[in-house]
Every structure is written in structure tokens, then in C-alpha cells.
Amino acid sequence: MNLRDKLRGLLVRLYARRVEGHLDHAQVPKHIGVIMDGNRRWAKAAGSTTVHGHRAGAEKIEEFLGWCSETDVEVVTLWLLSTDNFDRPQDELGPLLGIIEDVVRTLAADGRWRVHHVGTPDLLPSGMQTTLKEAEEATAHVDGILVNVAIGYGGRQEIADAVRSMIVDAHDKGTSMQDLAESVTVDLIGRHLYTGDQPDPDLVIRTSGEQRLSGFMLWQTAHSEYYFCEVFWPAFRKVDFLRALRDYAARHRRYGG
């Protein structure tokens, strides 16, 4: 690292410290959703492989959760694998699934996070299903950030699964379709989502400069604030995170009003 890079790094750290010092923790979002985009483009820009990009993105996760802990965030939803990602070439998908499984094991072993899977388990390899179940059981009583790992997740699929779950539940209770139809409410559907009774995201961060949601938590983000960051996920820094929090705190949330 040359002198210019060292000075730039020092200035960024000083700036981050200043932003953090002015941050009102009472205005910090309690639930943050993250669309961790840009692993492949980061790798290409670095002249490296796609797999290396995914590994670099995975290594950023614990660091990010540490920043969330420092600022009193209570719930984080990390979109690790979408239902659309299963269409990727096998030579990329296979290693990516292995990296994601390692992430889940690492989060569970850390002891600071409570891991919860959101997504369709049946889409995942049996080994990953087992890893997710073990991680949830091992961290069920951890008093720390609730980390939703969105793996095999799609927003439309979540709503379809919620409706299916609602119908199955009604059938098991002997409820007629007529009675079910009359009892359907927004709250009832919400309770059957992957996130259940969790609070909806206050803030959704998407990295890489893309300004679209791609189906992320379609139901839960009706009143969420969005922050689009130009930085690729593996290069996401604490100062970028703090800027997102500062931007969120400066907004006036209308909740549809």
C-alpha cells in the first residue's frame, strides 16, 4: 500500500468516526434488509474469478453484522441466493452454494447471531437444508441480532407460499373455504410469510448501483426506505453503512400517508 492509499484510508476512517459521532441511535432502523449485489462485477474489475468474488462477499457479512451490533440494529435480512440464481451455470452455482453453506455455519458458530432461514427449503440441496435447520436450532436462544438468511428466496414465491400455508392451516383446522375467504386479512397473510411476526424492514440497502428491488421482500417493504449504494458488496465499507443510516435518519417516513 502506497502513501496515497494510506492517507486515503486514514481520511475515510476519520470521516466515518465523525459520521458515527453525529448518529442518533434513537433514529437507527431496527430492521435492515440488504441486497448484497456486485460480487461478480467486483471480481471482474479485480481481474479475478467469479468464485473469488462470492467468497469476498461472504467474508464481508460478519463485518457488516458487527457494524449493525454497534449501532443497535435488531434484525438484519441478508439476501444470499434468489430463486432466479438457480438458473446460473452449474460451474458457478455449485461453488456458490458451498460458500453460502459455509456462511451459515460460520454465523451459527460465532455465537452472536440468531439465525433464521427465509426461503423455500425444498429448492435447496438436502445438505444445505440440514445445515440451515442445525443453525436455527443452535442459535435459537442467542440474545443477539436476528439474522434472516434469505436463501432460495423470491418475493413472489414467498407470497405464494404464505397463501398455501394459510390454506393448509385452515384445512387442518376444519375451516371451510368460505369461512377462510371471509377471514383473510393483511395481518393474517403477514403471519404466514417467512418472517412471520417480525417487524417489517425499516431500511433496505442495495449495493452495486442497481436501483431496483428484484422482488426482495415485496410484501414487507411496502413502507420501507431504500438506499442505493454505488459500491460493490465486497468493497462495502463502514463509512458506506453509516452514510446509509444518516440518510435514513434524515428522511421523514410517511407510511403511505
Mark where each language-model region is.
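Flexible, compositionally biased loop and terminal segments
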Residues: 1-257
